[in-house]
Amino acid sequence: MNNNSNNNNNNNIDQKNETTNEITNNTSNNNNIINNVNQNSTSITTSPILSPNNNINDNSMMDGKRLCASSKKVCSKRPMETYRFCIKHILEEPSAPFKQCEFISLKSQKQCTNPVSIKEKDPRFCVSHKHIIESTKKRVLESVVSSITSPSSSSPLPNASLIGSNSNITSPLQNLTTLNAFTGNNNNNTTTTTTTTTTNSTPSLNFDQQINIDIDNINGGDEPNLSLSASSFNFNIISNNDEEPKKKIMKILDRHGISQGRFYQDFKQNLKQLKQKHKQKQQLQNQKMFEQSQQQDQQQKPVQQPIQQQQQQDQLQIQEERQVSQQDEILEKQQQQQQQQQQQQQQQQQQQQQQQQQKKQQQELQIENNKENENINESNYFGEEFIEKDLEIELFKAMDDGHLSELCEDFDSDFYFASSSVLTDEELIQRRKIYISKLILLYKKQYNRFKERLRIIRRHYISTSLSLNQQNDSNKMEIDNNNDNNINNNNNNNNNNNNNNNNNNNNNNNNNNNNNNNNKLNKRKEEGNLCLSVNCKVKPMLLSKYCYSHILQDKDQKLFHECTYQLSANKKCGYPILKVQIPTLCREHLDIYETNNEIIKSLPKKQKQFIKQRIDIEKHNAPSTLVPVTQPINQNNQNNNNNNTNNSSKEESKDNNNNNNNKEILKDSDNTMIS
């Protein structure tokens, strides 16, 4: 035993010697540091920023730029102006006008490390914790006011199956005591609630509250001062998992301070009612106190003379009679008011019935007018008045954004940052994010408006163009029929007058028919039903006076370009092609371009693939080549002239055949354009 004790003593002595050596070493190191600081103290006092000639080992330089000089960890942020530290580590600078946030968490019992300026009032909190405290205050006060105004809407009673034998609860009024933990202030008006435990199997409810609201002290929109004392509870508050999604969203927005709270409007509406109730209660209390004081005085005083007693009794009787008469008058007034209200309701019902009948009549008239005006031209719908007023109201409504636009309009971004003296990078990014979200919503609305406007204008153009074309076609058919009838009548008259000269008359009739056909073609070209090029009998393209094969003759067109395939030294294909086409070749010459390997080999792979894809697409989409119309017409005309000189008897049959051939050619050309 003695040996063991000696060994322990020796070990303790060795440990003490080691600790003393470490202490001496640390003190020597500390002395060296203090000397270095004293030597360089002049540079620190003159300016907060360290000069480049300082002897302190500062590792805050990187690529010729100064960074934060924090000793706790390597910080890559730049320091503030006239200081050596960034915003997060500015508290390491003793001369900086900042102090630490006074917020202490209830769970970890640690203090917040964010800096706060000295100019702010006590208690000093950073922006985030200040907002948390304000939002919690609002929520607690709203819940208290709601429980006062509507006790049925308070937290529901628990079921017996969900409550255990031992259960504790905190009322919604206890949340006011938790605010003192945030702010550090203790109000004398508030009293902590006590919780009790019960061992009974069945739950028992003991709910006694004494609430004294000083509403007369409210100035403007200030919050009411509450003095609360709640007795014990023995049941748990059960969270409602079956809440509506809107309520859940509003709770989340309350935490972030975006909305004004669930009971904010109810609080405003019920302020007047609460004031009136409070005044009535005070009046009743004063009356009771006055009556009690009178009773006490009567008991204390000696018995007066019978005359005085009779006088008092008479006065009391008179007062009672007056009260009875006043009550009767009040009842009569109430009855009269009820009768008046009933009469007003009956009148309103009659007026509503009359209005409904008038509306029905107006609707019937509108339906009849709409039926009459269905065939009217739609050009009036695009006047200046319609575009300025009705389109903006009805047609150019923005798409549904899930109520994001309302949130952005109601949301005040300066609410967070108005009272803050310094902003971190995260807060600055948050502010910019809000502004960008507003811009995105504006651009979406504008895009939808332009899109709907283009749709309406396109429909209007199509409807007007179709109606005009139908009218023109009907008018032209009538004119052509009249001309044909006149020509036939003239020919019959000539035949009857000149029976002797059959040969000459037949020749004249043939010439007249040819001239009439040419006149018809010229008229149709002038009216815009045929292409303006010579000897072309094809319908023109939309918004132009030329067909597809002769579209290059139109000087105003800007979509088409000629094919660049060289047929000979000085000639090109010249067939119209879209300018977007790559390569600039028509459908027939694309195959030749594919087979010409010498040109394609010199190109890179990606360009080859792109050209092949374009060629395949254009083969499917390119319009088919048009049938030349001029050659067969000229040939038929020559045959007609030769046959007329040889055989006069067979001229009528040949002319009919030639006319039928010309009509078939026109139909073929029209079908090719339509395809």
UniProtKB/Swiss-Prot annotation:
It is found in: Nucleus. Its main location: nucleus. Residues 664-675 have a biased composition (Basic and acidic residues). Residues 1-39, 183-203, 274-324, 473-523, 627-675 are annotated as: Disordered. One of its GO terms (biological process) is DNA repair. GO terms for cellular component: nucleus. Residues 282-318, 482-519, 634-648 have a biased composition (Low complexity). PANTHER family: INO80 COMPLEX SUBUNIT D, PTHR16198. Putative regulatory component of the chromatin remodeling INO80 complex which is involved in transcriptional regulation, DNA replication and probably DNA repair. This is INO80 complex subunit D. It comes from Dictyostelium discoideum (Social amoeba).
